[in-house]
Amino acid sequence: MTDMPKTPLLDLVHRPADMKGLSDRQLVQLADELRSETVSAVSVTGGHLGAGLGVVELTVALHAVFDTPRDKIIWDVGHQCYPHKILTERRDRIRTLRMKGGLSGFTKRSESPYDPFGAAHSSTSISAALGFAVARDLGGVVPEGLGDAIAVIGDGSMSAGMAYEAMNNAGHLKKRMIVILNDNEMSIAPPTGAMSSYLSRLYSGEPFQDFKAAAKGAVSLLPEPFREGAKRAKDMLKGMAVGGTLFEELGFSYIGPIDGHDLDQLLPLLRTVKARATGPIMIHALTKKGKGYAPAETARDKGHATAKFDVLTGQQTKAPSNAPSYTKVFAQSLLEEATKDDKICAVTAAMPDGTGLNLFAERFPSRCFDVGIAEQHGVTFSAALAAGGMKPFCAMYSTFLQRGYDQVVHDVAIQRLPVRFAIDRAGLVGADGATHAGSFDIAYLANLPGFVVMAAADEAELKHMVATAVAHDDGPIAFRFPRGEGNGVDMPEVGEVLEIGKGRIITEGTRVAILSFGTRLAEVQKAGEALAARGITPTIADARFAKPLDREMILDLVANHEALITVEEGAIGGFGSHVAQLLSDEGVFDTGFKYRSMVLPDIFIDQSSPADMYAVAGMNAADIETKVLSVLGIAQIGEARA
């Protein structure tokens, strides 16, 4: 068991107000203790370590200078919020991070008044801060009051268009608000795009002219890790038109870059900004992800997301794998197909590792594109690749594909362009909770004309679906698969091209048919075994396709059974709704046929293990068994054999 760190000063700080009497020297000590406590807590729970370590000093400075919760600190994404939670009355629960009934791994309004705006997806903080600033000036009333609005946003999040939309609007409205650019040059993947080469221009404009003089020669005063970033200013100045930085052109007063780990810089700067700011301010702070904890600093992803680990060594404790992950199966299957077909290319939005496309990039760098946190652009870029004769695989998490939905409709579906959507993290994903659940993609894709929508029941099926997507050139096609390990099934050497819109019968039975879409098939089969012990043998089928439906198979199941139950890892309005529409159109319900659809409930399910989340959703084997007994009108074991 890891020893708890000694934190005598932090032990006295239960809320930000307790910091007001501390000297600047004591705040430095507080930051050191806060860093140790963050490392200790995440070693127990796992979670996003590196981001929080990179903003420890910034977190201390913000809470020491501003008056939270009246002043609103909005953490973009929220990965970096663990130190903030420790300082804001939640230290006693910090070792429940991301656990069932515990603290969220992100900011969450329902959890604390110190979390004024929830987050988990990126690039929303500036819009939210502007909204608070406008609400303040219009006389809005909230229990904690409305003071300053401060957005803390990383350089990775600055690759998303929404951040610039917000800055453009903020510059126009000229409201007093503060944006702190947390520039660590290391989001999850290396930062992408021209913006990453722009961020270090040493300049600051009105009303902070005194900072200009201090900025001269500041590069030489920065610690070595920060010098290189600051030197990028020289390259940018060569091609710049007269008129200040991009941020100033958008209407912000710009200060920076400063050392985001030096409280001797942060504290006086924030105090000056608080006292003198009149309009929107941009503070550019250079930080280091994983700062102060060597295993995180030296990790390739700077400790972005970790399992539980040993504090002394940084060694993570992960359970041994019994089967390859779905993500790895997808990536390897795509690599095999790309070896045979040079038209295959891959697109991801700042998630090369998470989607497995880092493997593709190593093998085929000229055919792999990380577009940054820019799902809208990524989808349209993929559409034009398809229009140009390529075979693009647009690999995104289900929850993030939502951000590019208009492009899916307007640029892909309406034009019937053969973009292949590889939808990872489908269904309930566990510790990241509701913000990362892949609950809605079946519904929002299967309602689009001409869209083919598949779901893999196991890892072998996923391999077949990759091959099917490669071969499909008649419009868009999507296949979804969950987070985590596969079922350990035998893997085919080569993926088989599936017939579009055709499912498969797994086991033949009588009375009731269970039609599964996706990886709940394993739970359906467990339910089938339990039902067999009761004398009930259901027919079990794997739909494979939510669109187009296998009309022939479904209507045959109806013709030969008393009841049909569909099961899917998606929200209301998805696969089951399409089956119900088919049955309605065919007049099946006119005969009194019994139909039930098992879907995710109409709630956002809080974090837990995926198994616990599916238990809450009523989607496990026992729930399926109960549904079968209910639809057949069987309440007791003895009735089943009657």
Swiss-Prot record:
Entry cofactors: Mg(2+); thiamine diphosphate
CDD domains referenced in this protein's UniProt entry, alphabetically: TPP_DXS, TPP_PYR_DXS_TK_like
Pfam families: DXP_synthase_N, Transket_pyr, Transketolase_C
GO BP field: 1-deoxy-D-xylulose 5-phosphate biosynthetic process; glyceraldehyde-3-phosphate metabolic process; terpenoid biosynthetic process; thiamine biosynthetic process
EC number: 2.2.1.7
Listed SMART domains: Transket_pyr (SM00861)
Glycoprotein is among the record's keywords: no
Associated pathway: Metabolic intermediate biosynthesis; 1-deoxy-D-xylulose 5-phosphate biosynthesis; 1-deoxy-D-xylulose 5-phosphate from D-glyceraldehyde 3-phosphate and pyruvate: step 1/1
HAMAP family to which the protein is assigned, alphabetical: DXP_synth
Similarity comment: family membership: Belongs to the transketolase family. DXPS subfamily.
PANTHER family from the UniProt entry: 1-D-DEOXYXYLULOSE 5-PHOSPHATE SYNTHASE-RELATED (PTHR43322), 1-DEOXY-D-XYLULOSE-5-PHOSPHATE SYNTHASE, CHLOROPLASTIC (PTHR43322:SF5)
Name the UniProt record assigns to this protein: 1-deoxy-D-xylulose-5-phosphate synthase 2
Organism per entry: Roseobacter denitrificans (strain ATCC 33942 / OCh 114)
Gene that specifies this protein: dxs2
